[in-house]
Amino acid sequence: FDLELGVRVAGERVSLVPPLLRLLREQPDLLGVVRGLEDSQTFPVALDARRILPVPAGRLKAWLLPLLEFLDEDRPRLSRHNAAALAGLDDLPTQWIGGEELRDLGRRLRDFSGMTRYEPASGFTATLRPYQQIGLDWLQFLREYGLAGILADDMGLGKTVQTLAHLHLEKTSGRADRPSLVVATTSLMANWRDEAAQFTPDLKVLILHGKDRAERFGEIGQADLVLTTYPLLVRDRETLLAQDWHLLVMDEAQFIKNPKAQAHQVARSLQARHRLSLTGTPLENHLGELWAQFDFLMPGLLGNAKRFTQVFRTPIEKLGEEEMRTRLGERVRPFL
């Protein structure tokens, strides 16, 4: 979808996106200036060389925040993962034209209204606790809309069993017509193997580990679930990159928090319909780690690294801007 902000001036429909983007590029402190105005005050926006439009500061504040993330584009394009960014604009007296599906998704991401309950499929042998059931519903919600996320429950609260319930439901529904890949630390290989055998015994599990693992590469296409480790993800990248996956899961996903590391780059290059990260610590040291997680999951959600630093990281970490902290929280909350 294209993002346009149209107003009528003397009967002519004029797009405010180009002049607002131009203003933001020319005046980096524009948002701060506008924030200092009362909502009822107006701010002059030059539409062209001849026309200046006074825009209410209240509307301008709401419009500028989403546009900050599109400064590198002359014509902003919205994808599904940008839907949450539109939620605040619904509060304005705005007439929307088109994009209803995207706006509806934005509202659902805002409060998760209408999230369907998905019972574990027959053959899944665990009994999910209430919060684990909510986790399964959320994973299915993300899958339904082609989104990705971070399951960030604390250690011991069942991230593995929730993921297995999701994988099993995908397989029994017929949606998983290709294998899924879990990348985890070496210490977690046995846990994944044992819990899969206990809770999803009808899933075909293939462990790619050990010196003889290359002998089992030919079995990847027949497996439902393939398990490997972060070091082997890099070593076996040629084989793993050649396979199309249904679900790609990064367990202990803090291991790909460095976007320059080979593990992150290989993981980002893998072809998968759906992606999921499991970690109890999505953010350990700085906001750049959070950006790296979402760069793997949904590239573009938080812009490129340079734009993320300009829009979010510097204002939050160095300037202590609570409004941008809130904005970032609202942006990632549906996916975390």
Predicted regions and their residues:
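ASCE P-loop NTPase motor core, strongest for the SF2 helicase catalytic module
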Residues: 95-336
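Charged, low-complexity intrinsically disordered regions
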Residues: 1-108, 176, 290
